[in-house]
C-alpha cells in the first residue's frame, strides 16, 4: 500500500511484465534463428543484457531502427537482397535498436571461424552482459557466443534454453557502469 500514489507500482508488477517480455523475446529470437538456419541465411544478432552498448563500441553503428522485435522483421533484415543483411542486428529487451551494425572482430580462432563468428566472439569478449546469436550462411549451423566463447552447434530449442537461462541470470535493472566491462586488450596477441 505504501507504493500507491508514488508511481512505483512497477516494483510490484514490473517483474511479471519483464518475465513475459523476456519469454516473448526468447521465443521470437529462437524461432527467427531456427528459420534462418533452415534456409541457410546468415544472421548475427547481438543481445544487450545491460552492457549499455554505445555507437562508439562498434566499427560502424549501422542504421537506428527502434522497432518492435518480430520474427518477420528479423527475417527481412537478413534477406540477401537487403542493404543491412551483412551486419549485426542489435536487440535490447523487445526492441531492435539498430541493424547493419559492424562489430569488432576477435583475434582468437582466426583460422577456424568465419567473419560472423569472429564478430560474435569479438563483441562478447569486450562486453560481459552481451550475447550473440550466429547463423552460418554456409552450413546453417546455430551458435551462441557468450563472454568470448562459442557454443556450437546448437538446435533452436537449445538456443531457447540458453537464452532463457541468460535472461533469468541478467540483472533486472542494470546500472550504466555495471555492464561496461572491457575484457580483452586488443594490443596483446591471443594464444
Predicted regions and their residues:
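Divalent-cation
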Residues: 1-191
Amino acid at each position: 500500500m505504501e507504493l500507491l500514489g508514488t508511481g512505483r507500482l512497477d516494483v510490484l508488477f514490473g517483474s511479471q511484465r519483464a518475465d513475459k517480455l523476456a519469454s516473448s523475446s526468447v521465443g521470437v529470437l529462437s524461432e527467427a534463428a531456427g528459420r534462418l538456419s533452415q534456409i541457410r541465411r546468415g544472421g548475427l544478432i547481438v543481445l544487450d543484457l545491460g552492457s549499455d552498448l554505445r555507437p562508439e563500441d562498434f566499427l560502424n553503428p549501422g542504421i537506428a531502427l527502434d522497432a518492435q522485435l518480430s520474427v518477420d522483421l528479423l527475417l527481412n533484415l537478413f534477406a540477401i537482397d537487403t542493404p543491412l543483411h551483412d551486419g549485426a542486428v542489435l536487440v535490447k529487451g523487445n526492441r531492435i535498436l539498430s541493424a547493419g551494425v559492424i562489430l569488432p572482430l576477435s583475434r582468437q580462432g582466426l583460422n577456424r571461424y568465419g567473419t560472423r563468428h569472429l564478430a560474435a566472439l569479438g563483441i562478447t569478449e569486450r562486453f560481459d552482459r552481451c550475447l550473440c546469436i550466429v547463423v552460418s550462411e554456409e552450413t546453417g549451423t546455430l551458435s551462441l557466443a557468450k563472454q568470448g566463447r562459442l557454443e556450437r552447434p546448437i538446435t533452436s530449442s537449445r538456443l531457447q534454453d540458453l537464452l532463457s537461462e541468460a535472461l533469468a541470470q541478467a540483472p533486472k535493472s542494470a546500472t550504466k557502469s555495471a555492464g561496461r566491462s572491457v575484457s580483452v586488450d586488443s594490443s596483446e596477441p591471443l594464444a
